[in-house]
Amino acid sequence: MEGLEENGGVVQVGELLPCKICGRTFFPVALKKHGPICQKTATKKRKTFDSSRQRAEGTDIPTVKPLKPRPEPPKKPSNWRRKHEEFIATIRAAKGLDQALKEGGKLPPPPPPSYDPDYIQCPYCQRRFNENAADRHINFCKEQAARISNKGKFSTDTKGKPTSRTQVYKPPALKKSNSPGTASSGSSRLPQPSGAGKTVVGVPSGKVSSSSSSLGNKLQTLSPSHKGIAAPHAGANVKPRNSTPPSLARNPAPGVLTNKRKTYTESYIARPDGDCASSLNGGNIKGIEGHSPGNLPKFCHECGTKYPVEWAKFCCECGIRRMIL
């Protein structure tokens, strides 16, 4: 090939050889330089040029990476036809109910309950939730079901093994008998009045004895709290807590025995100094405070329970009043 002159220079024209990688043609001298460079660029992936980053350089504009588009979740097939049919059935059932109410005939049966197929049913409580709520609820309901089952096992174990206190105590059965030696009657449990007891002023002794016996028989039907109130009237040695003024004791009301509740509330009046006494039909009876702790029993004569404190007046288990030795 002959050389050609261009712009005062000589350019050699020879045979052009193609590149094996990109397919372009080069002179043999240039192809030696192009070969390794083209091979390197082909094996190495070229980075995309971000023009916005280059424009933001030297300015206050922050360079934010572009957000990648999220793939849209697949759409579920809509159940609009089923929902439409359920809606029509509900309207027809409501119209039939209104017509039956107007005519006064028999009410039609309610339509069957409908469930949304898109909801997920909880295996523990059988309720239905959407996907987001079901993921949170099922774990919570699982823990709740485990706790309830554990509580049920614990309650059955405690029922199978009752406490010793419930095994020891048995409430006494109220039995009436004519024999004087039995201790089942309420009057025999209370201390009997001694011969040196105080007599009521202005009232015959026969009436006092009859009233005390009638009160002793009525103690069986009263609650433990009423027994504690009525017990001081049965014996002369028992000293109740509350008192009445001497003026009330000298002039007793005629309807004391007829109205028990009124008698109990009005006949007990506490003094500010702490000493108490009670009156029934004008008679004064001393309380437990006057006795020393040595004269009082430590255990209940009815159920055998020990009194928690020395000044206890009633049994904390059965409610029977504490006797005096």
Curated annotation (Swiss-Prot):
Region feature Disordered, mapped onto this chain: 43-83, 150-260
Bias (Low complexity): 177-188, 197-216
UniProtKB keywords: Metal-binding, Phosphoprotein, Repeat, Zinc, Zinc-finger
Residues with Phosphoserine modification: S223, S292
Residue list for modification Phosphothreonine: T244
Cofactor requirements of the protein: Zn(2+)
GO molecular function, one term: zinc ion binding
Top-level taxonomic group: Eukaryota
InterPro entries: ZC2HC1A/B-like, Znf_C2HC_C3H
Ranges annotated as biased composition (Basic and acidic residues): 48-58
Zn finger limits (C2HC/C3H-type): 15-44, 118-147
Residue numbers binding Zn(2+) 1: C19, C22, H34, C38
Binding-site residues for Zn(2+) 2, renumbered to this chain: C122, C125, H137, C141
Family: Belongs to the ZC2HC1 family.
Protein name: Zinc finger C2HC domain-containing protein 1A
